[in-house]
């Protein structure tokens, strides 16, 4: 199967287990938990911070609480990576820290929520006021350097695009628009896009 392929909803790719739609459903369930935790933090008045619980490590950055609460609709990206074992992840974590430390400088960035799950895999939810706001982060030199290092730290990744019509902390569930699938087991990396379920 060539790079840059378009898949149909629900389609998996033989030999690439991470493309199994069941994995995306697991991701969406995890994102729902992450969002519920975000809502609980906002309602408690705590918003950002770092904490642990149930074997998980949470790190939440909210540049401006009012914008997070009031922005409607909102756009989100959910990231799930199949991390490489026996690798020093310090370099890419340092880049992440540097990028997120400048979160208030990125217009439209509502929240950055990173979770290390009990199984030692990573997931995060990044929320924006609008889809085009994500481009400002994507084009940042630090983010570009992190992208260049991704293959050293992950076997594969799934990036889910989400639309929150009722806002990031509203009551309505998000619309699942699409998933970008990237496999770093070959060079150049194999990529595919699969539509979501609306």
Say what each PLM segment does.
Residues 107, 119-121, 154:
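Coil-to-beta-strand transition motifs
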Residues 147-161:
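Conserved short beta-strand edge segments in small beta-sheet-based binding/regulatory domains
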Residues 104, 138-139, 148:
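Alpha-helix boundary recognition
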Residues 1-117, 162-198:
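Short S/T/G/P-rich N-terminal loop/turn motif that feeds into the first structured element of a domain
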């Amino acid at each position: 199967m060539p790079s840059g392929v378009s898949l149909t909803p629900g389609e998996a790719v033989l030999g690439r287990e991470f493309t199994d739609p069941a994995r995306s459903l697991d991701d969406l369930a995890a994102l729902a938990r992450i969002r519920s935790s975000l809502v609980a933090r906002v309602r408690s008045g705590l918003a950002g911070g770092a904490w642990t619980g149930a074997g998980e490590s949470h790190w939440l950055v909210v540049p401006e609480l009012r914008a997070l609460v009031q922005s409607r609709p909102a756009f989100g990206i959910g990231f799930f990576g199949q991390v490489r074992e026996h690798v020093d992840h310090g370099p890419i974590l340092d880049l992440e820290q540097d990028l997120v430390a400048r979160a208030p400088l990125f217009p439209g960035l509502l929240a950055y929520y990173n979770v290390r799950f009990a199984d030692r895999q990573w997931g995060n939810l990044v929320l924006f006021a609008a889809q085009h706001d994500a481009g400002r982060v994507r084009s940042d030199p630090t983010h570009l350097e992190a992208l260049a290092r991704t293959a050293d730290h992950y076997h594969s990744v799934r990036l889910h695009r989400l639309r929150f019509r009722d806002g990031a902390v509203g009551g309505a569930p998000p619309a699942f628009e699409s998933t970008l699938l990237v496999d770093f087991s070959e060079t150049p990396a194999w990529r595919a896009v699969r539509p979501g379920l609306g």
